[in-house]
Structures are given as C-alpha cells and as structure tokens.
C-alpha cells in the first residue's frame, strides 16, 4: 500500500491516505454505496443508504448487508495506521431493523492495537440515533513478502 509521502509525519493525513487507497480498490464497499465520512487513526465513520435490493424477505435490510457495512468500517479503521491488516474474526449482534431509504452509519473505534493484532468495535446506527447493530472485529497484520523473499 503506498501513501502520500507528505502524510508520513502526520497521523491524521496518513490515516486518510491509507483509507482512501484501500477504498479505491474495495469493490464491495463501492457496491454498497458506502461513503467515508470521517477518518482518524484507529477510527472511521462510514454511511450508506439502504436500497430496495438490500432487503430480505421481511422487508428489512438483510443482516449480511449490515455485517458488510460494519466489516468495511472495521477494515478501514484497522488499516488507518498504514499497516496492512486483515480480519481474523468478527461477530455481530443485531438490535433493530433498518428499512429501505434509511441512512445507516457505522462508526469503528480501536479498542486495542499491537504490532500484529487489533480489536475494533463498530456501532451501526440509523440517522434517528437508534442502534441497529454492534460488531466486534479482530484483525491481524498481513504478512507480505519482500522482493528478496523475506516475510515481514
């Protein structure tokens, strides 16, 4: 992942650059119509509008879509430090339905971060402030091969 060289000394600019770089190639988040609203190191807020094609058989937003929204916020937050991280586990609790046309927000916050792992909480809310879901994700640093073949 390459980032703005100017951002190296500024954690907020580094976070914004890292998240923008990840979003540019994230077809799933783009397909959801996800918008990045706010970025800081270890914290990201994203929003989307529930579309008719996102509804389940009960006429409410499918749980998998809510999970994908939360997972995207989690991914952006754990990658906001400029280190490549991937999900190692996640769980979600659904608390209220979201309907077609509603705007939903996922706010991801860093709970714990080490050189190799991180824990992030994501709260998904409606524009009314009602909580739709709570998500917790665990990430691990992506091991990348260098040109010499060494694993970092």
Segments predicted by a language model, with ranges:
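Terminal targeting signals and extreme-terminal segments of soluble enzymes
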Residues: 1-152
